[in-house]
Every structure is written in C-alpha cells, then in structure tokens.
Amino acid sequence: MTVHVTGCSTATADQLVSREIRTESGQREVFCGLTGIVWLHRKIQDAFFLVVGSRTCAHLVQSAAGVMIFAEPRFGTAIMEEKDLAGLTDANDELDRVVTQLLARRPDIKLLFLVGSCPSEVIKLDLSRAALRLSQRFSPGVRILNYSGSGIETTFTQGEDACLASLVPELPAQTDTKPSLLVVGSLADVVEDQFARMFEALGVGNVAFFPPRKSTALPSVGPNTKILMAQPFLPDTVRALEERGAKRLAAPFPLGVEGTTGWLRAAADAFGVDPAKFEQVTAPNRARAERALSAFKSELGGRRIFFFPDSQLEIPLARFLSRELDMQLVEVATPYLHREHLAEELKLLPIEVALTEGQDVDDQLDRCRIARPDIVVCGLGLANPLEAEGITTKWSIELVFTPIQGYEQAADLAELFARPLVRRAKLVA
C-alpha cells in the first residue's frame, strides 16, 4: 500500500524512509537477459556474444535485433539439441568445436562472451570453466568471458548488468593518482559523444565510458575512480567496481533537463568545477531542451500514465514525465527498486505516487483496468491485449533501444510518449 498525502510536493529524506512501497511476487511478464545482447553487440564493436541455448533463444535475439543472420552480426547461438539436454553428448566438446570454428571464421573478434540461458543452466553446463579453458587456449589474441542471460528470476536489462560485471575483473588497475570519472552503462554513441564534449567543456578530465567501444581499450579503475551511473539497472556492476575501490556519485539519471543537469552537477561538484562555470556551460543546452520540451506539454500535460515493471527505467521516467511534462502518475511499478541508487530520483517523485516493486501481473492488470489511464508503459506481451481493450500503450523496451539520455534527446524522449496518444486520437477520429 502507498501512503497518500494531499498536494504534489516532493519527498523529503524523512518521508523517503517512511514511504510505503507495495511489493509483489506473483506471476511476471518480462523478457530474459538475452535481450541485452541487442544493444551490447552494437556497443562493444570487437566483441561477439555466443548464446549457449535453444532455438527459442536464437529466435528471440535475432528477432529483437532485427538483423538478418547472413549479415554476420556480432552474436550467434550454439544451439543445444535434444541429445545435449539428455546428456547423450559431451556439451563441452561441442562448445569447444563451435568456438574454434567461430574464431577461425571471425578473426576480428577480440572478446567472446559465452552467454548462459535457461537450457544451459537447467543441465548445469559450467560456462565459467568453459570460458577459463578456452581463454587459456586462445589467449592472448582473444579474451573469453561468460555471464548468464537466463530469464529465471530476472528481467531483461539485467543482461547488461551481468555482462558488465563479468568484465570488471578484466579492467586494469588505476596507476594514476589523479581522480578519474567512469560513466557506467551503455549509451548510444551519439549520446556518449555529447557527454564527452560536455565534460571537456566543464573541465572534468580523465573521463572514460564503460562499456567501451573497443574491448582493447578497457578503462582503469581504482581508489581514485568516481562512478557516475548512466543506467539504473547495474547494481552488480557498481558493486564490483566499488570492490575495486571506486566510489559512486549520488545523482539522478540523465533523463530530461532536470535529470541531466543533476547528473552533470554531481560530476562537476566532485571535480571542483566552479558553479558559475557550470551555469555558463550548461545554460544554453538547458534552454534549448526546455524550448523543445514545451512543444509536448499541451499533448502530455494532465495525462494519466501507468507503469508496468519491465526495464527498471520506470522511476527516472516517471520523475521526468511528472515534473517536466506535468503528467499524472497513476502507478509506477519497477521490477527491482534499489533504494540507494535511486535515492536522488525518489526524492523528486510526488510523495503521493503509488510505487510498486515486483509484479503480480493479474492484480496489476486489474488495477490498470480500474484506473483506465491515458497511456500505459509495459512489455510487448501486455501491449497488444491492452490495446485491444482500448488502452494506449508504449513499449518499455523501445525506451532502452532508443537514445533518450541528455539535453539533446529530451524532446525525443517526450515524443516517444506523445506519439501513441496522437496515433490513438487519429484512429478514434
């Protein structure tokens, strides 16, 4: 249950502690972590993602990526047949054969991820030992790591978290005593370039992004590294970096004008940037983004929105939509709510908003139908049934695939929510 308070003020630190959050643990509707390969294989340009799984796994990744297999993308599936699942063949021998063929055919691969799936975990195939064995065979030319993309008790963005966490032990130790900034979480190249220019203009030096575009250019990490999270779904990665001595900067996430400004300010404050310089550098970008957002307020202002738990972006998105576009939050549900990493976001949410962690899909569907919101953010599996009931939807997975961070993308993010409403209005007219 949620404590309802009159007014729309934001939460204080004391109210955050006392705010009740509904927790649910029933049936869920989510994709598995294999989906993360869709954006990770584009980000790390010399890496290959080899899923050890079933034909269903192969169809999921290929369909989600929208890439024809003859285009030779940087992902593939070592398909487990019935004889593998029945234990009639040595799965390790088969895996060694597939990896050898792959690396002979694709000499451009410098980093190979063996990605576990539900089938490989069911038969207890030890991909960590396989990765170690194959690394010894193919090093130093190819680094081979493993992580799980299984959908057993996970949601789809956890695939990136597992991938990056597996890469943290490979990061070189920091030797420079000067402080460095590590931006953690996959960003579109265009967004990464924008942030790099912004940090340079602010005078924040020694900035690196993780994951990098090339696995041969891994950033260093150590006690002088400050972490700035670009995505909210990376708790295991951040924990692994903190174990290496890095320190996380508390900040909202860079969605919208307010979030981007708070995110940049956290870095600027940590690196001693003069407030006047921060204002000088960011003011033109803020003003331009605010003008662009104003075009969508008439369409989105006052509209009621309901979030099903799917991407773990729900809370930063809700903050952006309520505070910058005047949308009304009916319910904001997220698969996992990391109180520490999302503390700055929770402070900015209206204190009366209904927050839910986890999902019991039938109960949540009932609440959604009773509320009849103007738009629902949900996974693909729920979108079509809700549309058939006359409820406008926005696919949450599209918000992960699309560049939405930073000042320049603020209006693009708003348009993603306005577009379904405009489409519905045209269909009804």
Curated annotation (Swiss-Prot):
<keyword id="KW-0479">Metal-binding</keyword>
<keyword id="KW-0077">Bacteriochlorophyll biosynthesis</keyword>
<comment type="function">
    <text>Component of the dark-operative protochlorophyllide reductase (DPOR) that uses Mg-ATP and reduced ferredoxin to reduce ring D of protochlorophyllide (Pchlide) to form chlorophyllide a (Chlide). This reaction is light-independent. The NB-protein (BchN-BchB) is the catalytic component of the complex.</text>
</comment>
<feature type="binding site">
    <location>
        <position position="118"/>
    </location>
    <ligand>
        <name>[4Fe-4S] cluster</name>
    </ligand>
</feature>
<keyword id="KW-0411">Iron-sulfur</keyword>
<dbReference type="InterPro" id="IPR005970">
    <property type="entry name" value="Protochl_reductN"/>
</dbReference>
<dbReference type="Pfam" id="PF00148">
    <property type="entry name" value="Oxidored_nitro"/>
</dbReference>
<keyword id="KW-0547">Nucleotide-binding</keyword>
<dbReference type="GO" id="GO:0051539">
    <property type="term" value="F:4 iron, 4 sulfur cluster binding"/>
</dbReference>
<comment type="similarity">
    <text>Belongs to the BchN/ChlN family.</text>
</comment>
<dbReference type="GO" id="GO:0005524">
    <property type="term" value="F:ATP binding"/>
</dbReference>
<keyword id="KW-0067">ATP-binding</keyword>
<feature type="binding site">
    <location>
        <position position="32"/>
    </location>
    <ligand>
        <name>[4Fe-4S] cluster</name>
    </ligand>
</feature>
<keyword id="KW-0602">Photosynthesis</keyword>
<dbReference type="GO" id="GO:0016730">
    <property type="term" value="F:oxidoreductase activity, acting on iron-sulfur proteins as donors"/>
</dbReference>
<dbReference type="GO" id="GO:0036070">
    <property type="term" value="P:light-independent bacteriochlorophyll biosynthetic process"/>
</dbReference>
<keyword id="KW-0004">4Fe-4S</keyword>
<protein>
    <recommendedName>
        <fullName>Light-independent protochlorophyllide reductase subunit N</fullName>
        <ecNumber>1.3.7.7</ecNumber>
    </recommendedName>
</protein>
<dbReference type="GO" id="GO:0016636">
    <property type="term" value="F:oxidoreductase activity, acting on the CH-CH group of donors, iron-sulfur protein as acceptor"/>
</dbReference>
<keyword id="KW-0149">Chlorophyll biosynthesis</keyword>
<comment type="subunit">
    <text>Protochlorophyllide reductase is composed of three subunits; BchL, BchN and BchB. Forms a heterotetramer of two BchB and two BchN subunits.</text>
</comment>
<comment type="pathway">
    <text>Porphyrin-containing compound metabolism; bacteriochlorophyll biosynthesis (light-independent).</text>
</comment>
<feature type="binding site">
    <location>
        <position position="57"/>
    </location>
    <ligand>
        <name>[4Fe-4S] cluster</name>
    </ligand>
</feature>
<dbReference type="InterPro" id="IPR050293">
    <property type="entry name" value="LIPOR_BchN/ChlN"/>
</dbReference>
<dbReference type="GO" id="GO:0019685">
    <property type="term" value="P:photosynthesis, dark reaction"/>
</dbReference>
<dbReference type="GO" id="GO:0046872">
    <property type="term" value="F:metal ion binding"/>
</dbReference>
<keyword id="KW-0408">Iron</keyword>
<keyword id="KW-0560">Oxidoreductase</keyword>
<dbReference type="InterPro" id="IPR000510">
    <property type="entry name" value="Nase/OxRdtase_comp1"/>
</dbReference>
